[in-house]
């Protein structure tokens, strides 16, 4: 079995739902996330603001980047997952919500294409989410923090970062290397992701970044390696980020089943695989999102006819690997924002 396929199979469990503020019953963005990592325990920490000395730098064990520290880092709530076996934690499993009401949850998109000359064993990995929480006052500023760090130091995995505040929700999708793209979820839209890239068309005329950010080499890089060729030379309107950068192996049964299940629960029918978002057919509340993150896969009833011991968690959104489920309910007053949390599986809450 290839290294890429093994990695995809290991991390194809998480789910994230985002509801735009005009599609939400609360009038603010809603975020729901199931974090799936086997044999983990979850700890929640409150980290205060910290002032730093001039010239101070920060490093992380999973990368070689030496990152200049800012004068002051913001306070945040840190949901940390740590393994029950061995030493250390799950470095790509943690989530954050800071004192300004900026929340970060992520989903693996393991399987991005990368050339031999761009393989990153160092750069930034786990550090990215924490640095966003420490440095951003808004979701948009969080995207800009992530973009600057990935451009300078490179990113060593493939991941979707969901960076949200009460008014805006952004999806920042990083590839292995120095490329990334970010798209804003529309205020009247609903978004779901299992573990694949979901950003497709990029509006390269959006130089004011109302809805998109992108790396300088985003299009040229896959062109150099034969992953994308424009139909008309010099016209990149047919560029599709997910298709250019994503391995087909991510279209596995686990991802496909969760996509079908989530979209059916949310809008009444499955959506094409790798859909980014759709116009919300109704307004969604906390209870709607709880129902989705608790969902077991649709064929379970049929399986029970053949095997009464069949687990409902195999290909569901709520799985036997789910370590923590979170729903973030933003409020106009950040002190009244609420994080609903279940340990471990949400179907038990």
Where would I find each of the regions flagged by the language model?
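Short, charged, surface-exposed loops that flank catalytic or proteolytic processing sites
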Residues: 135-141
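Short, Gly/Pro- and small/polar-rich lid/capping loops
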Residues: 1-22, 295-315
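Short, conserved catalytic/metal-binding motifs centered on acidic residues
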Residues: 17, 142, 326
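Second-shell loop/turn segments in exported
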Residues: 118, 128-135
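Accessory, solvent-exposed terminal regions and/or long lumenal/extracellular loops of proteins
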Residues: 252, 256-311, 315-320
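Short, well-structured alpha-helical segments that form the helix of a local strand-helix-strand
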Residues: 142-151, 289-293
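Substrate-recognition/cap regions that form aromatic- and gly/pro-loop-enriched pockets
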Residues: 302-349
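A contiguous strand-loop segment
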Residues: 3-125, 145-273, 283
